[in-house]
Structure formats: C-alpha cells, structure tokens
Amino acid sequence: LSQNPPGATIRPKGQAHVTACINKGDVMSLERCQTALKEWAVTVDALAKGDQILLMRKGGIHEEGKNFRVLYPQFLLYPTYEHQKSDLLKPSHQPELARILTQPAPKDTITFSYWAKIFEVLEISQQDQVDSLSPHFIWTNAYAQSRLYWKPMLPLSVMLLRVFRMEKPVTVPHLPEYTGCRSWVDIVTNVPLGKVTPVLGEAAFQRRVDEVKGSLGLAVGAR
C-alpha cells in the first residue's frame, strides 16, 4: 500500500488505504496548542481510557468546503455535549454517557485535558469495512454506518490517534465562533500543554493499531 498525503487521489472503491502518516511520539514536554478537534465527550472519554484509538470523519454542516480534511497532525481534543444519545452507543458505554449527562454541560467555558497526534489516516468506502471495525469503537454499527452513507461518493476518513494526557486540565472561555457543526476549531487562547503522557504505552498502542489495520486486511507492524 502506498502512503499518500492528505488530499491524495481516492483509491478504487472498497480498498482501504493509508492517506497520511505522522511520526509516533513519546512522553514529552510541549509548550502550547491552539488547534482543537471537536468530538463527543463520551468518545473523548473512551479515547482517554484507551478503549478506542480511532475517530471517523466525513465533515459537518459548517465544515469549510462541507468536507472533512486532515488539516493538522496534532491537536487538542474538544469535548462536545450536543447530539450525544444513549441509543447511538454500544451498551458497554451507555453508563458512561449517563454519568456525563448527569453533570451540567459547561456553556461558557471549555476544559481541555487531552492532546492527540495522528498516527495514520485510513480511507474506507464500504459497509463491510465499517462493520469490521466494530470491535474498535464505542458507537453502534448503525451510527458508524450513517457516517459512511452521508455523502456516499466520498470515502470515510478513519484517523488512528495517539492520545496524551496533559499535565493539568486547562479551562478557556467559550466564544461564539467555536459553535457550529465543524470539526476543527482555532482556539483564541494559547493552551499550555506542559508534560504530556500517552494514555497507552508504545507496545499497547502499536498492538491496537495492528488490530485495527488487521480488521481491514491491511499490512500490520510497520508503516
């Protein structure tokens, strides 16, 4: 399989492939970040616990160009609270959503606790490929398939993320320009990261990557 940069020509329908590769990272001390990727709070929680290492994207209503693009190799995880529903999650993670929903959703602030690096980006375009990834995500198969069926002529981007815990949570004001169904947000405030620690060790993370890629019939163990 060739490894192509974001925006590369789409492969024949039905063939999963790698479109971007970002170097792995270890425990490190970083300064600041102003780029964030929106995701349901319950999914961010699963990423933070190592229950999941992937996100799926095609785009949001307010996405620039209406299509999702992998614009940044690393970013803050921006937890969102709208549209989360128990029936869109597997039973194993419905209690976690119930816990999240019992807490008042912040309206005027955003708290960042996790930072992520894209390890690889895969593209898929078939329902059986989405179904094969089912063991690796917390959503129902029906919800994951709905991501695929939206704009069916475009492939679904599957981002494999190495997630890091920030040294301490950072809370910033929520601004009107952050609202809307878009994936990427430029945070006005420079968010200090401090020392970041991976939520999964190197061997455990690579094992999870191999499991995801193996489910799609891709070569494992090397990039």
Task: Write out the residue ranges for each language-model feature.
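Intrinsically disordered, low-complexity segments enriched in Ser/Pro/Gly/Ala and basic residues
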Residues: L1-P5, A20, M28
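Short, Lys/Arg-enriched N-terminal segments with co-localized hydrophobic residues
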Residues: K13-V27
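Structured alpha/beta reader/binder surfaces that contact nucleic acids or chromatin modification marks
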Residues: S29-R223
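Charged/polar low-complexity intrinsically disordered segments
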Residues: Q3-N4, K13-Q15, S86
